[in-house]
């Protein structure tokens, strides 16, 4: 079911008083046309007292043939605001794509060996040693596979270290793809972006004003002390930096009341951690400096004169002007004739 593919099954209650730093339950939405029938695409209908379009649940079905749910849409609006940012979430290099941790995890071209063995910097030493022992046990099988693939290169030793490394990666990808399925450990953590966004990095975004090269959104500073500036952007707490002297002066003058002001922020990067926490990095966009403002005010710009338009002529006026012109021409011809006589 694609609706429950991103957020793992949680053991926490639906209404928990403990602080939450990321969504713990999957949100299901129904359309207005099916809300009056209380149809949510589940195995059973929802009681008619529920008026919201968003619910969270623990079990699709129980022994009592009931779905445990709660009407809650707090994280839904955070997801919509994040999608309005237009930022594609990225992943740390050295880890396989969490959407494809099974047989297709070898598609990660940055670190193929770590992707195949499912090893990252957070892996324990015992797990790494266990994976290496499993790889060493495949040495004989790898020789047979290499002999069947290219016996001439193995016989004449006409291969380089890079060729051998590529062959090893290809052999491991085949063996991992045939011997293992979906990693059971991936079912206990957030898969991919947790349904937060499906934007692809490098995608060209258009707007009525042209191509959008930078995401600029309003935000508020949360603290003024220390080098680690925090800002509230789109319902998330982002790591923000500022090198503008104007912004620093405003921070110093306002102190804790800096939260009353809005600043434009450019969101540079966003990535989702294994526990579902969203990390944003943004920079505040400074305004025009005082030096540039003085240069702009010192320049004299000549304003283009306004274009005058001739008034419209009525049909009666045009007829009157035509008669006057005809009389002038007639009198001019008669006067010339008298002089000639």
Curated annotation (Swiss-Prot):
GO BP, sorted A to Z: mitochondrial translational initiation
Segments for region (Disordered): 1-21, 291-317
GO MF terms held by the record: structural constituent of ribosome
Basic residues compositional bias, start-end: 1-12
Pfam families in the cross-refs: Mit_ribos_Mrp51
Domain of life assignment: Eukaryota
A cellular component annotation (GO) from this entry: mitochondrial small ribosomal subunit
Compositional bias (Polar residues): 297-312
InterPro entries: Rbsml_bS1m-like
Entries under PANTHER family matching the protein: 37S RIBOSOMAL PROTEIN MRP51, MITOCHONDRIAL, SMALL RIBOSOMAL SUBUNIT PROTEIN BS1M
Protein name: Uncharacterized protein in HIS3 3'region
Organism: Lachancea kluyveri (strain ATCC 58438 / CBS 3082 / BCRC 21498 / NBRC 1685 / JCM 7257 / NCYC 543 / NRRL Y-12651)
């Amino acid at each position: 079911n694609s609706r429950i593919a991103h957020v793992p099954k949680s053991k926490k209650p639906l209404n928990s008083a403990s602080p939450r730093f990321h969504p713990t339950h999957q949100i299901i939405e129904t359309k207005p046309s099916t809300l009056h029938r209380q149809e949510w695409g589940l195995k059973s209908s929802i009681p008619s007292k529920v008026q919201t379009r968003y619910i969270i649940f623990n079990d699709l079905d129980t022994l009592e043939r009931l779905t445990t749910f709660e009407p809650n849409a707090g994280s839904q609006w955070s997801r919509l605001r994040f999608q309005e940012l237009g930022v594609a979430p990225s992943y740390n290099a050295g880890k396989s794509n969490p959407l494809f941790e099974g047989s297709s995890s070898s598609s990660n071209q940055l670190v193929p060996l770590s992707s195949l063995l499912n090893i990252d910097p957070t892996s324990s030493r015992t797990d790494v040693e266990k994976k290496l022992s499993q790889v060493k046990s495949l040495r004989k099988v790898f020789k047979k596979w290499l002999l069947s693939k290219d016996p001439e290169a193995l016989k004449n030793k006409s291969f380089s270290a890079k060729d051998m490394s590529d062959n090893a990666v290809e052999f491991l990808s085949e063996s991992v793809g045939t011997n293992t399925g979906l990693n059971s450990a991936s079912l206990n953590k957030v898969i991919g972006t947790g349904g937060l966004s499906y934007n692809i990095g490098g995608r060209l975004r258009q707007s009525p004003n042209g191509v959008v090269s930078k995401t600029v959104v309003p935000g508020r500073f949360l603290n003024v002390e220390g080098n680690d500036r925090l800002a509230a952007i789109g319902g998330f707490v982002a790591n923000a930096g500022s090198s503008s002297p104007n912004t620093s002066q405003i921070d110093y003058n306002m102190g804790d009341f800096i939260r009353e002001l809005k600043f434009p922020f450019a969101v540079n990067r966003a990535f989702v951690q294994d526990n579902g926490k969203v990390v944003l990095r943004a920079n505040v966009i400074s305004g025009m400096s005082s030096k540039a403002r003085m240069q702009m005010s010192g320049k004299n710009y000549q304003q283009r004169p306004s274009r005058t338009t001739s008034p419209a002529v009525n049909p009666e006026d045009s007829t009157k002007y035509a008669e006057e012109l005809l009389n002038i021409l007639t009198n001019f011809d008669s006067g010339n004739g008298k002089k000639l006589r």
